[in-house]
Amino acid sequence: MTVDTKENEKEKEKEQLGISGKTGTNVLREVLQFKVVYWGPGESGKTTNYFRLREKFDGLKLNRGYSIQTTDGRTLWQDSIRLSFYLNLEAIKFNIITQIVTATGQERFLSTREYVLDGADGVVFVADSDSDKLEQNKRSFRELVSFTSEKNIPFVIQLNKRDLEKAIPIDEFKNGLGLPRFENYGDGTQVVYPTVALEGDSVRKCFEDLMMLVLLNFFSE
């Protein structure tokens, strides 16, 4: 019997998330659709996260995605692939479709960013580890909090570009944004997710942990 190693690897990845493309014995009762926004200052790595997710969830893509760019080649708005996977909850199987959108980090497009957040179920805040960009991180984070504070939208914080020579210490970053000094919240999610999106480091874990928060938020309403 010939074994397709690449296909098996994809199946193992799906199983780790509780994902399955098989119907099994459970009855598919409901389709859940969520929207996840990647938010942060300009050039912090939001679009890079998007491309890494496309690679890591290649077997679950529903569409190829598309983007809108400014005349200088910067991303204005990008609608990622929709990801489809299953969640087994007792005798019910949910088909979960997640739309991923990246918001521009350019400050002159603030109104566009607020529009992108409309209908969001979760947010990944992507900060830049460059020590010279702490103020940009703080401004972008304040904007995010102001838009989400009354909407009960869960978010996780990703500190990208940890491979920079002058990367800001994580404790200094936490202090600048007014975050807790401990590493994990009571639900197990991290206060800050150190990442190197170019290499794909921790990009998937950050996304998966946010999706758990989104699902918990949905089922607790």
Where are the model-predicted features located?
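Switch I (G2) and immediately adjacent beta-strands of P-loop GTPase domains
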Residues: 65-108
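Conserved catalytic network of the ASCE P-loop NTPase/AAA+ motor domain
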Residues: 73-76, 88-93, 114-119, 146-151, ...
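Amphipathic alpha-helical interface segments within eukaryotic helical scaffold
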Residues: 108-109, 114
